[in-house]
Amino acid sequence: MSRLEHRFAQLKTEGRAALVTFITAGDPGYDTSLKVLKGLPAAGADVIELGMPFTDPMADGVAIQLATLRALDAGQTLQKTLQMVSEFRVDDQTTPIVLMGYYNPIHRFGVEAFVAQAKEAGVDGLIIVDLPPEHDAELATPAQASGIDFIRLTTPTTDDARLPRVLERSSGFVYYVSVAGVTGAGSATTEHVTEAIARLRRHTDLPISVGFGIRTPEQAAAIARLADGVVVGSAFVDKIASAESPEHAIDGVLTLCAALAEGVRSARR
């Protein structure tokens, strides 16, 4: 059983959803980002998505685009992102880490080398936002063969005809993008999410995590009553962007994480 499978199974027995947190690797600098990464589990993160900075983050809104630029300006590379995971794993062998980003840096790195180093570092899953199922076998097949889950995105525009193709060979969990658009967009209604999750459950037994637009403990709790996972990203990135110092960035992210975690944990009480 993979770390992701184990974590979602564990939380199912506890009767609650997972808090899935996103930060961009290397934002605002390597050392600060690593401290945030290491602090997230104790603050309540159940699964961590770690963004791989790329020069053309077309699926991301302004907040994450700026986070990517800060990280790249500070010297972050894909190799350093894998190094961050390795350093995280020294003290934490249980919290799943999912790398999220675009295919171009992986292609340039070399798929075989990337998969091997990601596995060695302790990466548990991949979300590659610009690789549709028709074109992802070059990465998905070797990743899954090595034990790294390949997590695909579904959206409000993914109809029943296409959904089986998107879910085919998916593993880890399904990421439902609740709002069509870029990251940080407005949140969907609970009625819409309820209907979407019911439709997804007719097609898959995988855990379903819902993201895009969730920023407050109240919003997190509302989604946690419906989904297996609640994904929060832009709200954390905004805390880093507005911080007056690295210490304030770390404190801001971890304080928000704790509040969101309480919202998720209280949702089904």
From Swiss-Prot:
The enzyme's E.C. designation: 4.2.1.20
Catalytic activity: (1S,2R)-1-C-(indol-3-yl)glycerol 3-phosphate + L-serine = D-glyceraldehyde 3-phosphate + L-tryptophan + H2O
Record-level GO cellular component terms: cytosol
Family matches, as InterPro entries: Aldolase_TIM, RibuloseP-bd_barrel, Trp_synthase_alpha_AS, Trp_synthase_suA
SUPFAM superfamilies (alphabetical): Ribulose-phoshate binding barrel (SSF51366)
One MF term in the entry's GO annotations: tryptophan synthase activity
Keywords noted in UniProt: Amino-acid biosynthesis, Aromatic amino acid biosynthesis, Lyase, Tryptophan biosynthesis
Recorded metabolic or biological pathway in which this protein acts: Amino-acid biosynthesis; L-tryptophan biosynthesis; L-tryptophan from chorismate: step 5/5
The protein, known as: Tryptophan synthase alpha chain
Organism (species): Pseudomonas syringae pv. syringae (strain B728a)
Lineage, broadest ranks: Bacteria, Pseudomonadati, Pseudomonadota, Gammaproteobacteria, Pseudomonadales
Gene that this sequence comes from: trpA
